[in-house]
């Protein structure tokens, strides 16, 4: 918004009034500061100075207040406050920073106090004391030149440094010198007894100055001496502080003290009238000295206050210049801000007009935006719902997959267990069939043994009957007996050789059987390990996929069984042919053995132990055949081996004539082999 002219005038008037108020306040503060300087200096001196100078400082302040005139009100208030606060000022007032005047005031008042005599005597004026001191110096220099030269040789350098100061400060020693030499000029009249005391007092004060000068030289700066005041040109600075205090008595003073007349003569020579005159003059000089000291202090304070006021004025002018520059900068900044606000107000008005025109379109867009937001919210809800459904389906599919994997593993385990159980069942069935066949063969063997036993018993009875009957004696019988014995011996040898061959072939058969069993067991274990590794490394595929391979294996096994069955049939035909040949040979031999009935009894007696041995061997062979049936892997090979061995064992007796016991033995072997073949089929 643009500012009006009245507002601008008010702001300018406020700045000008503020500036006037600040300048007036700064002036008042400068006056108050100038009025309080004297009070602060006297307060510092009273607090940290010599306690014996307090009364002197109060007297100086009161005289300055009475003679000041211009600054009567401020100094009076400061003196009243000082007199009121004097007893407890060290406890209540705070320590102010030194202004460079503490040591100066302390030294001035200590000098005033030491130069003032403590009795009510009037001092001569400054001009009289100065002229009289010069006159005395000229009178005393001639008679005491020798002493002064000797003393000045020892302390020449301190005297040269203090000549100018002794001339300016001659009134310090003018009191005692004037009294002494005035008494000498007036005819050596006796003086009062107080002057030696005054002289001694000044000598003691001079020694005290020498002792105090060492401490002031270390602690206080060089100050100005207020007694050498020139009213036209101000006052001159004294020499350095160490030259004022750290000096020895001059040769003139030493000689003056040593050559002064006795105290009794001075008292007798001075008259009472001269004493009163000197006392009055001393009092008047003291008063003048106090007045001049007060004036010098006042002038010094005024100069300091003027300098302080000038410094304050300079700082005030600098502050005013800074304030004016700041006001100008603020004014420029305010004008620039006003212009900017005017320009922005114009632009805002234009924008408001354009906004009014576009308000309807903006409202329509807001409505469309709200509709789109609602649609987006609905779509987001649908998307979130679909995501939840997808997550549910995914979790469900994962659960189904996990269950499928678990069922697959379980089905695989069940399938393996089923295969194992099937194999076990088949093995049990085979064993049961073999057991039944073995039972049948055992029954058949028992039947054969019973028939053989009955036949042998019949033969034995027939032989016993023949032995009981009388036999004819003749050459034919002797020849027949001899021939029968030879035939019997040959048959026995043949039987023994056949038994040895049988035993050898049985051992060979057992060895080959055990070797084949070991080989088949190793192959079976390797196949089982291979199957287990395949099953473990492929847990994901189904068992239904393995069915073709199992069917193929079953088909291979069936084909192998068929081939083995064909081989067995061939062996059966060979066995049947050999049996027929053996039967034809046995029939031819039976016709030759029928006439020898007596020899048959001997043969039967020899054949019975052989038959029993053969029965034992047959039973052992049957047990071995039953053991081969228990091995589930190679029953056919063992049977083929036995069938291969049987022709070899049966081929040898072709060219040999056999006894009936040997025929029965081979019949038993043939029956056992036929029964074993039937069992395996």
Swiss-Prot record:
The keyword Membrane does not apply. It comes from the Eukaryota. Residues 68-106, 589-618 are annotated as: Disordered. InterPro entries: Angiomotin, Angiomotin-like, Angiomotin_C. Phosphorylation at Tyr-126 is necessary for efficient binding to SRC and synergistically functioning with SRC to activate the downstream MAPK pathway. The keyword Zinc does not apply. Disruption phenotype: Morpholino knockdowns show pericardial edema with accumulation of erythrocytes at 28 hpf with no circulating cells present in the trunk vasculature at 48 hpf. Constrictions and lumen narrowing in the dorsal aorta, these defects are not seen in the posterior cardinal vein at 48 hpf. Morpholino amotl2a and amotl2b double knockdowns show significant defects in endothelial cell anteroposterior elongation at 30 hpf. Disrupted organization of radial actin fibers that connect perpendicularly to endothelial junctions at 48 hpf. Pericardial edema is evident at 48 hpf. Residues 90-102, 597-611 have a biased composition (Polar residues). The modification Phosphotyrosine is found at residue 126. Keywords: Cell junction, Cell projection, Coiled coil, Cytoplasm, Endosome, Phosphoprotein, Wnt signaling pathway. One of its GO terms (cellular component) is bicellular tight junction. Residues 268-319, 362-441, 481-508 form a coiled coil. Residues 68-84 have a biased composition (Low complexity). Signal peptide: none annotated. Expressed in endothelial cells. A motif (PDZ-binding) lies at residues 678-681. It is found in: Recycling endosome; Cytoplasm; Cell projection, Podosome; Cell junction. Interacts with SRC. Required for proper architecture of actin filaments and for cell movements during embryogenesis. Plays a role in the radial actin fiber architecture in skin epithelial cells, thereby maintains cell geometry, size and cell interconnectivity within the skin. Plays an important role in coupling actin fibers to cell junctions in endothelial cells and is therefore required for correct endothelial cell morphology and maintenance of dorsal aorta lumen expansion during embryogenesis. Belongs to the angiomotin family. This is Angiomotin-like 2b. It comes from Danio rerio (Zebrafish). The lineage of its organism: Eukaryota, Metazoa, Chordata, Craniata, Vertebrata.
